[in-house]
Amino acid sequence: NFLKKYIPGFENARLRCVAAMTGVRESRRIVGVQTLTSDMVINSSEHKDSVAICAFPIDIHDPVGSELNWIRKKKICCYDIPYGTMVPQKLTNLLVTGRCISATHEALASARISATAMALGQAAGLAASLSVQEKKACQDISVEKLQNLLEKHGAVPGKKWL
């Protein structure tokens, strides 16, 4: 009811369904042009084609128990997420965001958080818009133009924007 009452556009919204299982943190992922790895997370990597940043450590939850394993080999400031992690290797004009990006199990344990998913969603939306405007496939757009658009819309496309 909060959304209906306070957020314009939600007046007629309704809950259609909920997940069959709570706490699912990982699902299928694409094989992308680039793959986010635990080394990239741990080493706070920077990428020329970054479209989002994440500053969450690697937290791996036990799928059957309650144990939590934090991987903190050194203090993680934040790391860039490259555009190529959203671009499938073998499909054109498709962008994938959230926990389905091209990432290793360990890297996804950091990147799957909501704030990062929202940043990647914004990047994908602007990339799709740029793709239509430039009459190019999503994988062929200028990532530099995308980064400029993200910055114009108040996003932080990478560490160098901090």
Residue ranges and their predicted role:
Residues 1-162:
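Flavin (FAD/FMN)-binding glycine-rich loop and adjacent Rossmann-like elements that form
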